[in-house]
Amino acid sequence: LRSAPDNTYLTQWMKHFNNLATFLPFARAHGYEGMIETSWSTSGTYGFHYDNGWEIISMQPIRQVYPMSGFQLLIDAYCKAVNSSKAIHAETFIKEYAQQRYGLSEDEAQTFLNYFLLPQELVRHGKDAKGKPIEQVIQECEELKSNFNKIVPRKQGGEFEHYRLMLDLRINYLQYKEVEFTYESSRYDVSQASGLATQLKKIIGEAGKLDKRFIKLNKDYLKPGQAEEINALRNEKMNELYRTLSRQAGL
C-alpha cells in the first residue's frame, strides 16, 4: 500500500494501484492463501549521530510519510482487489469511488482522477527524477490545485481535506526546492541572499499554516505530539536554509 519514495510531500498513487492490479492476481494465481500486512513506516531510512571511531550515539528516522488517515481510498481499493477474482482497474475504481464516497459529479470525478494521475517524483538539482524542470513541476501542481479546489464533496468532507492538504504540502516542498536550487547553484552569489531569504520566509509562513491544518486533520489519528514532530522534521531543512541566508544577508 505504501513504499519509498513516498514522503509527507510526495505520494506515487498510481504505483500503489499498479501493485494492487498486478501483484494480487499474481499471488492468487500462484496459490497464496493469504497476506499479512506489516508496517515499517520509515522503510529503514535513518540518520545517525556519531562519536569518534564512528560509534553511533543515536539514530533518527529521516523518512516521514503522510499518515494512513489520508489513504482510506487506497485501503478500500486493497480490500476490493483482494476480494475480486479480476484485477482492479485503477481509473475506473477512482472515478466510481469519487462519486459513491464523496458524492462528486461526473466532471468532478474526472478532476479527482487527475489528482492521482499527476506524476510525483523527488526533486534534486532543479529537476525531478524524470528530468522535468522544477518550474514546470510547480506549474502543473498549481494548475491541478486550481481545478481541484473547485470540487465540493457532498459526503465525507473531512476525509476529503486530506487530499487538498497533501497537494498543498507538495507545492510548499517544491517552492522550497526551487529556492534551494538557486542557493546551491554555481551561479549563486551572496548578493542574492536577501532576496532568497525574503522568498523563503514567505514559504515558511505558508508551511506554518499547513502545520496547523495537518494537526487538525490528524490529531485524533496520531499519538500526542506526533503530528508536531512530523511538522518539525518536514520544515527543518527550510528553516536551516533560512537561517543561513539571513546570516549572509545580515538580517
Regions found by a protein language model. Give the residues of each.
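Substrate-binding groove of N-acetylhexosamine-processing glycoside hydrolases
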Residues: 1-251
